[in-house]
Regions:
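Extracytoplasmic/lumenal domain signature
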Residues: 33-42, 49-80, 88-96, 101-138, ...
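Intrinsically disordered, low-complexity serine/threonine-rich segments
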Residues: 5, 17, 31, 416-417
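Low-complexity, intrinsically disordered regions enriched in charged/polar residues
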Residues: 11-14, 56
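Exposed boundary/loop context
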Residues: 4, 16-20, 43, 491
Length: 513
């Protein structure tokens, strides 16, 4: 059903108050704090670990499906657009951002996870960043702030907060990191000049972080940068160039969600000048810069390449190490695989890289989830490992890899020492009319990992969803979602009942037993 969309009252909005009072009657006692969502946002949590709270059900049937893009940006093979992750509450409400079309914008829908019945919907006036028009269309930024509220990007760099996510009815409120009164006074100017450019990330205290763009002459002196909305509703921001300590830095990397340390005190994200990037660390309360590292190609030592068609975001490991995927320079020298750069928590020590980084966010697997693993690392990483079919370069043997961040081997595709391959699995389907051994790509930018069963849920461009058993290294299950389609990479998600959510050809599928 349609919901009321109204701005918040003047002055700071207390997010904590909204969480406690939304829907409370008269003198009723405030309810206890909401439970933790099953899947809060991109890659599951603020560290982007990709870990599930429930083991996936067997892949035997499609329970329900919904279209996530009604006017996809098409090419011959399939849609080339990044889509926002579905979010799932502990009560099994699935929040799905939907692209209606280039001119009609976006909306957000809430579904009952058990049967796919739509419970609510609301539109957003969000517009995509002006600078993204030459890249694959970006997703609409959204995150569950807690188990009862969703934050969605709105027009002019604002955030729309929908309360009572698990209920049919709920109010939608608007908040602006630069002040709602300023937005009201200069609505048209803000809407024309300011857009949110990254997925939203929720901190452990309920703060929301995101990158934004601001055109020249934007109201309030805004410049491209990073914003925070605190649990009490107060906004703050910092220019991208101040985060990097370099005036030439122009913006936050498009589509790259901020990642947070496990204690929530340090955030990480990429800033760019043209296609040259820096990974920066910042204080999550004050937004003051803490750390910075210029990103380089491990093979050529040239500047690594950051482009807007990538959705790569940092991952924070259990030990605080930070991982971030980049393209090489030149990109063809490593078969357009890119590199997974690996840093300590202070970004001062560059560790062994991974042999793939293009448009991916690695997921984290406790080493105890892989009984046959004989190494010494406490955790492992799941990485896309495609070797794209490019004449004179890649052979089209596209894989996923389980990598050991604490061990090294010689790269199969260069002379660089890279993270050790614990397991790899080749995609199973030959591409028609291509050389023998050239298989469909693994179509993933973030995969759901189940620590309990030691398995990974991964999409493939052959139209199937697969379960990869990390202990045996075998693809043990699959289900057909649709016809083969070349498309921008998508994520997998697992809900609290074990339903797996996967996208193929602009459709979200709910899969289980």
């Amino acid at each position: 059903m349609s919901l009321r969309l109204r701005p918040i009252a003047a002055g700071p909005l207390s997010l904590a108050v909204l969480a406690l009072t939304a829907g409370a009657a008269g003198g009723s006692p405030a309810p206890s704090a909401p439970a933790r969502p099953a899947w809060a946002g991109f890659a599951g949590d603020a560290q982007h670990s990709g870990q599930t709270v429930a083991s996936p059900q067997p892949l035997t049937s499609v329970h329900w499906k919904v279209t996530v893009d009604h006017k996809p940006s098409c090419c011959v093979d399939g849609p080339l657009a990044h889509y926002a992750t579905p979010m799932v509450t502990s009560a099994n409400t699935v929040v799905v951002p939907v692209r209606i079309g280039p001119r009609k914008g976006f909306r957000v829908d809430g579904y009952a996870g058990a049967d796919g019945v739509r419970k609510w919907t609301f539109p957003t006036d969000y517009t995509v960043p002006i600078g993204s028009l030459n890249d694959w269309p970006p997703p609409i930024p959204a995150t569950l702030v807690n188990d009862n509220r969703v934050a969605v990007a709105g027009g002019g760099g604002t955030i729309l907060l929908r309360s009572h996510v698990n209920d049919v009815q709920g109010d939608v409120h608007r908040i602006a990191f630069y002040g709602i009164d300023s937005y009201r006074a200069h609505r048209a100017a803000y809407r024309a000049a300011v857009q949110i450019t990254t997925p939203l990330t929720t901190g452990p205290d309920g703060s929301v972080y995101f990158g934004f763009s601001a055109a020249a002459g934007a109201p309030g002196g805004l410049r491209n940068g990073l914003a925070r909305i605190s649990p009490t509703g107060e906004g703050s921001w910092v220019p991208a160039r101040r985060l990097a300590g370099v005036d030439k830095v122009t913006r936050i990397a498009l589509n790259s969600a901020p990642a947070l340390s496990h204690d929530g005190r340090t955030g990480y994200l990429a800033v760019v000048t043209g296609s040259v990037g820096r990974l920066v660390g910042f204080d999550t309360t004050s937004l003051r810069p803490k750390y910075e590292h210029l990103l380089r190609d491990p093979q050529t030592q040239g500047f690594a390449t950051i482009i807007g068609s990538s959705s790569a975001t940092p991952t924070v490991g259990p030990d605080g190490d930070v991982f971030y995927g980049v393209l090489g320079n030149p990109t063809l020298k490593h078969n357009v695989r890119g590199w997974l750069l690996h840093f300590d928590a202070t970004l001062s020590h560059l560790r062994t890289p991974g042999s793939f980084g293009w448009d991916q966010t690695v997921s984290v697997v406790p080493s105890s989830s892989v009984p046959s693993y004989a190494g010494t690392s406490s955790y492992l990483l799941v990485s896309k490992y495609n070797n794209y079919l490019i004449p004179g370069h890649g052979d089209g043997r596209n894989e996923i890899a389980l990598l050991d961040p604490g061990a090294a081997q010689k790269d199969r595709f260069s002379r660089v020492q890279v993270m050790q391959e614990v397991r790899t699995v080749l995609a199973p389907t030959q591409v028609p009319q291509q050389p023998p051994g050239a298989v469909y790509e693994w179509c993933i930018n973030s995969v759901a990992v189940d620590p309990a069963s030691g398995s990974v849920m991964a999409n493939n461009e052959d139209g199937h969803l697969y379960r990869w058993d990390l202990d045996t290294g075998q693809l043990v299950e699959n289900i057909r979602l649709g016809d083969p389609a070349g498309e921008a990479y998508t994520m997998t998600v697992v809900g609290p009942d074990g339903t797996t959510y996967a996208m193929s050809n602009a459709v979200l599928y709910a899969v289980g037993s």
